[in-house]
Amino acid sequence: MRINPTTSDPEVSIREKKNLGRIAQIIGPVLDVAFPPGKMPNIYNALVVKGRDTLGQEINVTCEVQQLLGNNRVRAVAMSATEGLKRGMDVVDMGNPLSVPVGGATLGRIFNVLGEPVDNLGPVDTRTTSPIHKSAPAFIELDTKLSIFETGIKVVDLLAPYRRGGKIGLFGGAGVGKTVLIMELINNIAKAHGGVSVFGGVGERTREGNDLYMEMKESGVINEQNLAESKVALVYGQMNEPPGARMRVGLTALTMAEYFRDVNEQDVLLFIDNIFRFVQAGSEVSALLGRMPSAVGYQPTLSTEMGTLQERITSTKKGSITSIQAVYVPADDLTDPAPATTFAHLDATTVLSRGLAAKGIYPAVDPLDSTSTMLQPRIVGEEHYETAQQVKQTLQRYKELQDIIAILGLDELSEEDRLTVARARKIERFLSQPFFVAEVFTGSPGKYVGLAETIRGFKLILSGEFDSLPEQAFYLVGNIDEATAKATNLEMESKLKK
């Protein structure tokens, strides 16, 4: 982290005059720049091209040095469109990697890859900036303690708990509730952990980014009246951006998150949507730079690029960055090098199911497909582990019996199986939960359920204590006491109707 010198500083103007190059070649988003002998910029240095195009329009393009070619030439990748650039234009070596604004001033705002605000809400305080290229924290700084990151969402905390400072893969198609789940997590970390969130939109649709921003304003995650009270900073590099921007926007978001962790000593949630697009952009840049492609046409440096990003996402003794990454699986092929490389870094997976969404069970997290390396008795304790295993066994048995029920009906099942089905249906409904950010749509107030309450509730259902209660009582409630209260209300309503 550094405090920016002003542009009027004589030291800056001398450096800018000193390190001046000229464009020698332009191939799409890739520029070759010639510098005077002995004035070559370093790899990853930012280069800025300023001037006017043939129509007299101002041009301001930032590039990043990727290769030193020899003969005093460098090859750089542009972070924005290169239309209007001409050979012979002046290029200034900034002498540093790209630096972006960090700190409280970023909350409630939308930035591009260069850290420039793109939400028409005026300039951002850029006195405190940080370079996007950094080393991962040293081993001695890491917090190696295994601890659960409580989200307040029952299905996640019980069956696929998140690790504090871990990485979680979020799998789900369109319309199954990814955005709502992301917003609820942003809301809960702010309330329960006093933390903030950073959302990195990497190579996804501009419309989705806009929808997310509007929904965040509607649900109060972004406070329009007082931006400083917002809980999230947004960084977008969407589908229409050049590959250089899409490849680096993840690092911009990560840099903002690192400041909250290292300087403000907070717990941070970092969302990356979509991690596959980060790999895809790297593949495009690799081809443009003339590297020999590897398996399935991906860049030969795929594992290194992924590792460089993922290793910076971790817990230190000061704070933590817990990352939730949406993973697009091309053609549903989990062996494709992009998702396969991502899986190596994940501690947990949260799989959203269209079947559950169709039943109206939200969050539509699939309890059998979602996994976590944290679900071990030595980490979560015997009680939590046993309860989670029993819940999974009950749901698995219900899944196996569904074909028989569809053909022959419930009456043909044994007494034991009928009891299992009844409990499984209660569990399925109890895994649903009203969200704070969905209050606008559901009309029922959101609920944050602590881990101890979650375990107690499921243990009571499994023990058969609530076999007499209707399954409807367990739908969209918080803890188990609310379910019993709802059952009493339902009973009174049915008596009144009679």
Curated annotation (Swiss-Prot):
Catalytic activity: ATP + H2O + 4 H(+)(in) = ADP + phosphate + 5 H(+)(out)
Gene Ontology annotations of biological process type: proton motive force-driven mitochondrial ATP synthesis
SUPFAM superfamilies in the cross-refs: C-terminal domain of alpha and beta subunits of F1 ATP synthase, N-terminal domain of alpha and beta subunits of F1 ATP synthase, P-loop containing nucleoside triphosphate hydrolases
GO MF annotation terms: ATP binding; ATP hydrolysis activity; proton-transporting ATP synthase activity, rotational mechanism
Stored PROSITE patterns: ATPASE_ALPHA_BETA (PS00152)
Binding, ATP: G172, G173, A174, G175, V176, G177, K178, T179
CDD domains to which the protein is assigned, alphabetical: ATP-synt_F1_beta_C, ATP-synt_F1_beta_N, F1-ATPase_beta_CD
HAMAP family documented for this protein: ATP_synth_beta_bact
Record's function text: Produces ATP from ADP in the presence of a proton gradient across the membrane. The catalytic sites are hosted primarily by the beta subunits.
Subunit structure: F-type ATPases have 2 components, CF(1) - the catalytic core - and CF(0) - the membrane proton channel. CF(1) has five subunits: alpha(3), beta(3), gamma(1), delta(1), epsilon(1). CF(0) has four main subunits: a(1), b(1), b'(1) and c(9-12).
Protein name according to UniProt: ATP synthase subunit beta, chloroplastic
